[in-house]
Amino acid sequence: MSSSFGKIFRVSTFGESHGGAVGVILDGCPPKLKVDINMIQNELDRRRPGQSDITTPRNEEDKIEILSGIKEGLTLGTPIAMLVRNKDQRPRDYDNLDQVFRPSHADGTYHLKYGIQASSGGGRASARETIGRVAAGAVAKQLLKNFCNTEILSWVKRIHDIDSDINKEKISLNKIDSNIVRCPDEKISAEMIERIKQLKRQGDSCGGVIECLVKNVPSGLGMPVFDKLEADLAKALMSLPATKGFEIGSGFSGTYLKGSEHNDAFIKSDDIRKLRTISNNSGGIQGGISNGENIEMKIAFKPTATIGKEQKTVNAEGKEVLMRAKGRHDPCVLPRAVPMVDAMVALVLVDHLLLNQAQCGLIDN
């Protein structure tokens, strides 16, 4: 069971949804990096359950504990251990599901592969596992900001069939966090919130799309063939719970264009090390390597699998049964998934930044 991610900037998460705690070991972080613990806590607060009436009612404080690797606000270059204790877990909510495979959950596949069942809140398959990722991602975001002035901004673009068209030039973290659904369009966000509440009352759920914009990306991140930057971003983002799709740049819509329409023409620049393009259909990555333009991505999240409606399924004996979920869950995962997307993008970019420095740092281009 793989619980580690990254090559140099390596993250290993641990813990289960209804266990004693969840956390992360972050190895490979450079020493003497200034780390704002409050910023880490703020990122955890953004993904915390119980933050609004459109998220799960599970009420966790999610207070971060730094066990090692940071002293007096500076990284030591040693493994950084961070922990969050579970305080509002209710495993008994799942007692009636011990031998039942919940539709579109990990119960059935975990049983087939490992001979165990992750019915109690999903175990390692739960979004609670992402606490460690978000904490590590907050460290990565600070490293990117300090060394490259790189900024990662993710927001909810679509909920169910309610879509938005955001002006990326005017996007900001304050606008994203100005409402509980994390869509920076005031009118559209109100419609999204009402749709989520409507489905929640019906015992149902919905999915949607998160859009991500990365500004001030260093050129040269990523490597040809098997370690392309977009390939690692896709793997990282598709490893998040409930993800079902990934696009970069023009994505699937680019298939409707001709080559003459899709090509990103280069334009004259005073600094040849900073290639600029008229358009950005490539999404800031060409040949698997960042070109210095903004990286633009979209990530699709399925409707929450745990719903309040009665459903047909089978038990461990293969017999058909009826079940109705009793556990606390999000009617829509997207508002809390925004900081998860930020974190995974930051972890990939920092890992590639360090890889690029290791391979090309001594080369004078």
UniProtKB/Swiss-Prot annotation:
GO terms for cellular component: cytosol. FMN binds at residues 124-126, 287, 302-306, 328. NADP(+) binds at residue 47. One of its GO terms (molecular function) is FMN binding. Its EC number is 4.2.3.5. Pfam families: Chorismate_synt (PF01264). One of its GO terms (biological process) is amino acid biosynthetic process. Pathway: Metabolic intermediate biosynthesis; chorismate biosynthesis; chorismate from D-erythrose 4-phosphate and phosphoenolpyruvate: step 7/7. This reaction introduces a second double bond into the aromatic ring system. PANTHER family: CHORISMATE SYNTHASE. Belongs to the chorismate synthase family. This is Chorismate synthase. It comes from Prochlorococcus marinus (strain MIT 9215).
